[in-house]
Amino acid sequence: MKIVTYNVNGLRQRVSQFDSLLKLLDSFDADIICFQETKLRRQELTADLAIADGYESFFSCTRTSEKGRTGYSGVATFCRVKSASSSCETALPVTAEEGITGLVNSNSRGGKSETSTVAEGLEEYEKEELLMIDQEGRCVITDHGHFVVFNVYGPRAVADDADRIEFKHRFYGVLERRWECLLRQGRRVFVVGDLNIAPFAMDRCEAGPDFEKNEFRKWFRSLLVERGGSFSDVFRSKHPERKDAFTCWSSSSGAEQFNYGSRIDHILVAGSCLHQDEDKQGHSFLACHVKECDILTEYKRFKNENMPTRWKGGLVTKFKGSDHVPVFISFDDLPDIPEHSTPPLASRYLPMIYGFQQTLVSVFKKRRANEEAKAIEVSCSSSTQSNTSSICGDISTGPLRNCGSMGISLEKSCSFENKSTSGVTEAETVAATGSIDNLSDGIRASSVRALNISRDGDRKKARKIQSSQLSLKSFFTTNSKVNNVEDSSSSYVSSSPSSQVESITEPNVSGKEDSEPTTSTQEQDQTGSSAKQKNDAALMEWQRIQNLMQNSIPLCKGHKEACVARVVKKPGPTFGRRFYVCSRAEKQTVVISNGLHQNSETSKRVMRSK
């Protein structure tokens, strides 16, 4: 059996690198694969990231909304199985749990998250404090019968960040309580993952004299058997004297080229062996069952065109891959366990993967709503057709002499019906035209029907469209035009019927519809052109600044080579400031005959700030 732990630094990117999740998982040839730093929120889980043939997956995603930590962490455990419905395989867990407190229990089959009881051994902690610990999605626990696997992504805390240091203390304190409780029950515990702790000086390149005095390193060493604890650091137990065995390097400084890194990805094992001998002296799971544990240094983590050349120097390159390497443990095949099914926490049961289960009530409600919508649609279409036919029928049955005197055709009468939807009410139409008593009965009926249709819905759409085009000035312009028409209405009344109809069609409809959009369009064009000019000016200025910075890159004082730009990401007064450093990769210090020669990293100080 084989277990692999790997900080993927973004699961989506690693899946894209291998073209599919299945190819990524098969590349390890392992039974249990533990990923850290998946950088996925729960709503971002999709089948292509969580489901692969022959594997069952269990995720823990970040739930915090804290700035800078949304979708930041996250862990996932993939188990290779032959049958998911019912199996005796050890790789398929009997139970699975998200988080370490027992309070985060995803009822995946129902699509909801419910609160469970506090895990055994954590009763003295406040409930709110425990909930905060599991908000960042840093652990998945799977019980495989013979052993319990803790897939852990430990918090990172810099020296001057008191809040994160306190959180790291609470996290590992609660985690240790869970381990102790299981060990008292006689269970075997495997802890795998990125713990963000290098326990010994030999686990860090160029560790300082006070390196091992760090409180978290002291806590890690207190867990080990040789220090009176219950756990064994499997890699160090198998390779006690190996140096320069690192699992993580800084990608920003190209440190992997010179193996300038640290060992922070671990596999810890605690518990007895499976032998039934009464004399347990010298027996342990590590001594009796573990065959090998090593670092997969040659594992393909980069795209082919970006594969680094290790320990051969060169300029810094931004590698497109994880800044960690996998670590594996292999041990003898274990006996099968009683037949069991896939735990409810499995991704196959997540609502975003398999969908939400509908109830009978929701099905009938949806069907009734669809029937009502269809009935309304049919009634609306039939009423619209009848109104249109009656309007055109009234116009066609009107006196031919009126149509001749108007000088318009049937199409123009229907266009008058559509134009009435521009927001002109019946009172405004009457005021603008003086009187409509001289119109024929057919034209009067069609006008009234057109106004009714506009009130029922078409006028709302027209107003919505025009509201995005009109400016405040255009409303005053419209009012002035209507007032001018009202003042001159008496002159239209004294004219012939044909001139009255012309006054309706020309000043009220055509004049109003043509003039207003022209004014608003001109104003929009002027506003858009001025904004475009400002954007173009800002873009040109920024390009000028970039060209100036590019042409004024300083040289490294030691190597006389062009430096590279960096940005300060540490919170403080210099946050966001740009500076220059040596372009060569980070490496160890070299001692030569005439004294101490500093490495390129320690010599690349700030050359110029921007």
From Swiss-Prot:
The gene is APE2. Belongs to the DNA repair enzymes AP/exoA family. Probably binds two magnesium or manganese ions per subunit. Its cofactor is Mg(2+); Mn(2+). It is an enzyme of class 3 (hydrolase). The lineage of its organism: Eukaryota, Viridiplantae, Streptophyta, Embryophyta, Tracheophyta. GO terms for cellular component: nucleus. Keywords: DNA damage, DNA repair, Endonuclease, Exonuclease, Hydrolase, Magnesium, Metal-binding, Nuclease, Nucleus, Zinc, Zinc-finger. The active site is at H324. It is found in: Nucleus. Disruption phenotype: No visible phenotype. Ape2 arp double mutants have no visible phenotype. Ape1l ape2 double mutants are embryo lethal. Exhibits apurinic/apyrimidinic (AP) endonuclease activity in vitro. By contrast, another report show that APE2 has no biochemical activity. Unable to catalyze the conversion of 3'-phosphor-alpha,beta-unsaturated aldehyde (3'-PUA) to 3'-OH. Has no in vitro 3'-phosphatase activity. Redundant with APE1L and at least one functional allele is required for seed viability. Has a strong non-specific affinity to DNA. Signal peptide: none annotated. Its main location: nucleus. Expressed in both vegetative and reproductive organs. Mg(2+) binds at N7, E37, D194, N196, D323, H324. GO terms for biological process: DNA repair. It comes from Arabidopsis thaliana (Mouse-ear cress). Zn(2+) binds at C556, H559, C582, H597. This is DNA-(apurinic or apyrimidinic site) endonuclease 2. A zinc finger (GRF-type) spans 556-606. Residues 517-532 have a biased composition (Polar residues). Its EC number is 3.1.-.-. One of its GO terms (molecular function) is endonuclease activity. Residues 486-536 are annotated as: Disordered. Residues 488-503 have a biased composition (Low complexity).
